[in-house]
A protein has these predicted regions:
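Acidic, metal/ion-coordinating pockets
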Residues: 1-268
Length: 268
């Protein structure tokens, strides 16, 4: 069983690298299940639209996770209630529309995969306690009982919080990855009890930028230049960044984790 997890898709350049590469990668690596974080996929890098989500599904994505930008496009409020494959962080207010986790079949209907979307509490917009939410979900998505495999996308700023969640799910989830900071970390590994982990899997976007945004305009904003405009995504060649987890069908835990970085400035 192979699961592909890709980092935040950033604006048009990020969508383009997905469109040009995802189907080929799924075939090349014999991927069974694909999860991407789509919360920056809109043209301005903030939020996601119905049409973009549906493009991702047609390109082979099984589940789209998100984070603090999930509500930036108003149309998504209605759509997320209708489309169970689009997740918002589970620890948003209880009354929030949509779901923060779900159970999905692989394309061949052979396996059930649990996908959990969480958002950090530190330096992020106010949410419910992420560990309390995680505790409740652990009682609902149980490896080798109601799912064959499970993965967690933890959308957060702080390395320590991400690492703590990784250890909290160690042995009870196939993999835990961090998103949000848009730069892939070098700590790709399998934890003590068998859970694949990486603090941040980066972004699918133009790295010749400031975390995906146009670098010239970003510098103007840092320098308080009156000519600076609102942030907008960089438009150069994008890098596709994520990981592939190879999992044991008997235990549901990770056997191997491989970093996947292709295209754009990170590979040149």
């Amino acid at each position: 069983m192979k699961i592909l997890l890709l980092g935040d898709v950033m604006g048009p350049s990020g969508r383009k690298v997905i469109e040009n590469n995802l189907t080929k990668l799924i075939d090349e690596y014999d991927i069974d299940f694909t999860v991407i974080n789509g919360e920056n996929a809109a043209d301005d890098g903030k939020g996601i639209t119905k049409s973009i989500a549906e493009e991702f599904f047609l390109q082979g994505v099984d589940v789209i996770t998100s984070g603090n930008h999930i509500w930036d496009k108003k149309e998504i409020v209605e759509y997320i209630d209708q489309e169970e494959r689009l997740l918002r962080p589970a620890n948003l207010a209880e009354a929030s529309t949509g779901n923060g986790y779900g159970i999905y079949f692989t394309k061949n209907k052979k396996f059930k995969v649990g996908v959990i979307n969480l958002m950090g509490n530190v330096f992020m917009r106010k949410t419910e306690d992420v560990f309390e939410t995680a505790k409740k979900i652990k009682e609902k998505i149980i490896l080798k009982k109601n799912v064959d495999f499970s993965v967690v996308d933890f959308h957060g700023e702080i390395t320590s919080e991400k690492m703590a969640i990784g250890h909290y799910f160690d042995g009870v989830s196939t993999g835990v990855v961090g998103t949000h900071t848009h730069v892939p970390t070098a700590d790709t590994r399998i934890l003590d009890k068998g859970t694949a982990y990486q603090t941040d899997i980066g972004m699918c976007g133009d790295y010749n930028s400031v975390i995906g945004m146009n670098k010239e305009n970003s510098l103007k904003k840092f320098l308080k230049d009156k000519k600076a405009t609102h942030h907008f995504p960089a438009e150069g060649e994008a890098t596709l960044s994520g990981i592939i987890i190879e999992a044991d069908q008997k235990t549901g835990l990770a056997k191997k984790i491989t970093r996947l970085i292709t295209g754009g400035s990170l590979t040149k």
